[in-house]
C-alpha cells in the first residue's frame, strides 16, 4: 500500500487492551494503515509480542489507575510529539447472576476498569490533543449490552451504557478543539469475554471459540451464517480514527452487530 493510500499515515495511536482480541487486531490494522501504535495493557508478554510484531511499543497500563493512562499518553508525546488517536478498548466482565446476589465490591472493580478507564483515557488524550492543536479521534469500546437488555450482566450493562453517555457529553465539550469522540458497540464477536459468558449461560465449561462462533452465526445476527470477528470491529475503529472517512462524525455509537439490535430474526416469516 502506497503511503498516500494509508488512512492513518504518520498518525500516533494508543490502544488500551491492545494485547489481544479486538485491541490486537486494531493495532495491526492501524499499523498497516501507517500509524505508530502504542499497545497499552496489563498483559505484558502478549502486549510486547503484539508491539514487536507491528514495530510499535508496549507500555504496562492498568486503565483503572489514572497515573498509568497518563503515563501512556506521556510516552506517546515523548516518543512522537503527538497523539492523534486514542482507542479506549480495555474492559472486563464479571461472572454475574441475579441482582439480588450482586457483589458491590466486584461491581466497583468492573466500573473502575470499564468506566473510569474510559474517563481516564478521554481526559488525558484530550489534554494532549488540545496541546498539539491538530484535533484527534477518541474511540471507546462499548457493547450491544449498552443498547438493550438481556445481552449482559447488570454491572457490565451499566458500564457500557455509561460509556455511551460520556461519549456524547465529551463530544459536545471537545468538538470546538477538533476532537471527535465516538464509540463502537460490538455484538456477536467471540472474544474471551463473550466465550466465557456463553460458557456460563449454557453451563458448558469447555465451549470453544469455534462453537460460540457457530451459535452466533445461527442465532446472533440478521446475517444468517455470519458471526462477527475482531477484524470487523478493527475496521470500524479504523473508520472512526480516519479524518478522511469520518471527519464529520462525533458523538456517535457505531453498532457492529450484524443487525441484531435493529430487529428480531424470529419474525422473518412475516416477509414471506
UniProtKB/Swiss-Prot annotation:
<dbReference type="GO" id="GO:0042802">
    <property type="term" value="F:identical protein binding"/>
</dbReference>
<protein>
    <recommendedName>
        <fullName>Short-chain dehydrogenase reductase ATA1</fullName>
        <ecNumber>1.1.1.-</ecNumber>
    </recommendedName>
</protein>
<comment type="function">
    <text>May play a role in tapetum development.</text>
</comment>
<keyword id="KW-0560">Oxidoreductase</keyword>
<dbReference type="InterPro" id="IPR036291">
    <property type="entry name" value="NAD(P)-bd_dom_sf"/>
</dbReference>
<comment type="similarity">
    <text>Belongs to the short-chain dehydrogenases/reductases (SDR) family.</text>
</comment>
<dbReference type="InterPro" id="IPR002347">
    <property type="entry name" value="SDR_fam"/>
</dbReference>
<feature type="binding site">
    <location>
        <begin position="14"/>
        <end position="38"/>
    </location>
    <ligand>
        <name>NADP(+)</name>
    </ligand>
</feature>
<feature type="active site" description="Proton acceptor">
    <location>
        <position position="156"/>
    </location>
</feature>
<dbReference type="Pfam" id="PF13561">
    <property type="entry name" value="adh_short_C2"/>
</dbReference>
<feature type="binding site">
    <location>
        <position position="160"/>
    </location>
    <ligand>
        <name>NADP(+)</name>
    </ligand>
</feature>
<keyword id="KW-0521">NADP</keyword>
<feature type="binding site">
    <location>
        <position position="143"/>
    </location>
    <ligand>
        <name>substrate</name>
    </ligand>
</feature>
<dbReference type="GO" id="GO:0016491">
    <property type="term" value="F:oxidoreductase activity"/>
</dbReference>
Amino acid at each position: 500500500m502506497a503511503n498516500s493510500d494509508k488512512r492513518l499515515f504518520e498518525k500516533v495511536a494508543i490502544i488500551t487492551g491492545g494485547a489481544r482480541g479486538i485491541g490486537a487486531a486494531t493495532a495491526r490494522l492501524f499499523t498497516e494503515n501507517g500509524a505508530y501504535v502504542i499497545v497499552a495493557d496489563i498483559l505484558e508478554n502478549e502486549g510486547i509480542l503484539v508491539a514487536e510484531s507491528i514495530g510499535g511499543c508496549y507500555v504496562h497500563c492498568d486503565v483503572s489507575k489514572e497515573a498509568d493512562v497518563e503515563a501512556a499518553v506521556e510516552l506517546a508525546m515523548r516518543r512522537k510529539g503527538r497523539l492523534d488517536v486514542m482507542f479506549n478498548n480495555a474492559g472486563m466482565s464479571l461472572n454475574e447472576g441475579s441482582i439480588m446476589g450482586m457483589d458491590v465490591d466486584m461491581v466497583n472493580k468492573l466500573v473502575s476498569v470499564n468506566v473510569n478507564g474510559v474517563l481516564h483515557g478521554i481526559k488525558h488524550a484530550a489534554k494532549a490533543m488540545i496541546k498539539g492543536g491538530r484535533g484527534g479521534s477518541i474511540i471507546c469500546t462499548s457493547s450491544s449490552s449498552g443498547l438493550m437488555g438481556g445481552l449482559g450482566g447488570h454491572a457490565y450493562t451499566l458500564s457500557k451504557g455509561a460509556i455511551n453517555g460520556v461519549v456524547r457529553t465529551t463530544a459536545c465539550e471537545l468538538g470546538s478543539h477538533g476532537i471527535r469522540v465516538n464509540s463502537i458497540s460490538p455484538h456477536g464477536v467471540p472474544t474471551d469475554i463473550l466465550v466465557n459468558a456463553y460458557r456460563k449461560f449454557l453451563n458448558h465449561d469447555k465451549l470453544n471459540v469455534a462453537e460460540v462462533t457457530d451459535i452466533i452465526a445461527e442465532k446472533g445476527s440478521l446475517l444468517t451464517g455470519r458471526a462477527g470477528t475482531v477484524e470487523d470491529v478493527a475496521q470500524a475503529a479504523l473508520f472512526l480514527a480516519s479524518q478522511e472517512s469520518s471527519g464529520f462524525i462525533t458523538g456517535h455509537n457505531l453498532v457492529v452487530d450484524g443487525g441484531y439490535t435493529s430487529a428480531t430474526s424470529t419474525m422473518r416469516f412475516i416477509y414471506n
